Swiss-Prot record:
Residues 127-158 are annotated as: Disordered. This protein binds to 23S rRNA in the presence of protein L20. It comes from the Bacteria. The gene is rplU. Belongs to the bacterial ribosomal protein bL21 family. Residues 131-158 have a biased composition (Low complexity). Pfam families: Ribosomal_L21p. This is Large ribosomal subunit protein bL21. It comes from Bartonella henselae (strain ATCC 49882 / DSM 28221 / CCUG 30454 / Houston 1).
Amino acid sequence: MFAVIKTGGKQYRVVANQVVRVEKIIGNAGDVVEFNDILMAGQEDNAIIGAPVVRDALVTAEIIEQARARKVIAFKKRRRQNSKRTRGHRQEVTTLRILEILTGGLKPKKAVAKSIKEEAAVLKATTQETKSAASVKKAAKKSAPQKQAAVASNSKED
């Protein structure tokens, strides 16, 4: 059985026990994630095509590692100007092992932690809580009281 999943703005054709590298997914090595955006699923001769997604379809995968892809070099040179610029970029990627592909509303065999969208929502909520806790500032202190000697010297002038 195969499935076409959508993650990170890309589409991947996956089968059970396949290892695939996708855009970064939140989670640690060993975590189990599930994909709900299944565009197509089925056998070679009998496929279900979603409009836009297949109902009651689920793909579970295990995170093998979080890594960074090879460096991509962006080099610009302006001729006769003695000007050039070199920049590098390394994309963060996640290596996954596809555990099972389920259709027809079947439940996964292994206990699945959370779906990717739920994890992202939880992460966003926790970051907002920490930002709000960090943004609470104490009021500035009033100016320091005058020293006794300065007050005494002012009263002598009178």
